[in-house]
Amino acid sequence: MRQIQTDRLIIRPLLIADHDELQEILLDPQVVRYTRYRDLKTPENFDNVFATHFLETPFAFGIETKIDHKLIGFYEFHPEATTGVLTYALSQSAWGQGFVAEVGTAMMAYGFEVLNFERIEAHYASHNPRSGKVMAKMGMRDLGSFGISVSPHTGEVREVMAYELTREDWLLNGSQQQAV
């Protein structure tokens, strides 16, 4: 993937040079509280995930600010047949600025045009409704409850909510933009 630019951001493949900044983001308990990465607790845990999951993949991307070229988070797809399940996280300093929705619009195009997904889905914990609002801003449709999830590490029980966007709806809504 070449980089994709939005008004304020650069979306690009993650690099070895991003290790320390991404580690800082993903080892922040508040950032990963509602994500699949909440069980990363140590630099060693992160190192393994970084090497095997974030580098050299067409599915994970760094989010960098144009103004100072700082890595502020990541966005990724988990492919499941013709569906891409998305995950994203931003450093706390980047919260509340509309970055995820801005990136999401470009990444929907990438998911449909380049990765050829027929459907993009996103999940969030019911007690984190801000994520649901961001998904709606990205043009996704609320599917309601996806079921209950129990953390294998903490035993925490969460209701998981889901949103989706189909290729057909994306084309009908005219929300597409150039992906690459």
Language-model-derived ranges and their functions:
Residues 30-51:
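Conserved GNAT-fold acetyl-CoA-binding loop/helix
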